[in-house]
Amino acid sequence: LDFFQDLFDYPYPYPKYEQAFVPEHNIGAMEKPGLVTFTEDFIFVSGATEDDLEGRANTICHEMAHMWFGDLVTMKWWDDLWLKESFADFMGALGAIEANGFNDAWVTFANRRKSWAYLQDQLPTTHPIVADIPHLEAAAQNFDGITYAKGASTLKQLVSYVGFDTFIEAARVYFKRFAWGNTSLQDF
């Protein structure tokens, strides 16, 4: 939490932060304001590899980043799901490196997440990162490699273009300006 509070120059927005492991949870992890639930697969009962530990750190940071990207500031409509998921995916890798010491997290990101985005982008179901979501049933289709990994890859490119400090300063302004509100691409 301290890493993101310092990075975003915005205090953790909830009275407490808890994590719960949910047996037979049907997805890896999910955040709610103040609580993240994880599948029991993240509890290592025997020799976890460095890759296992990095993956868990990345997931924890991804879900923790949602406390700002997604909960403190929420998208206006599902078209802008990327404002929540792409940023959390990017912050997962960043947090794995900066807060947890997994120095190869960007290499892992390139090998796994970015390649997932490339594969998803070749399918007939590909779509823009900012998608046209006409109704709620269509929203479920966008929890995919485009919204998560392609969006995060695009953010990584943006950081390379504008610089890390400029990017983070924009995020800080975004949180201060839109805290407890809803946004779209035009607001960012």
Language model region names:
Residues 1-188:
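Hydrophobic alpha-helical and helix-loop surface patches within well-folded domains
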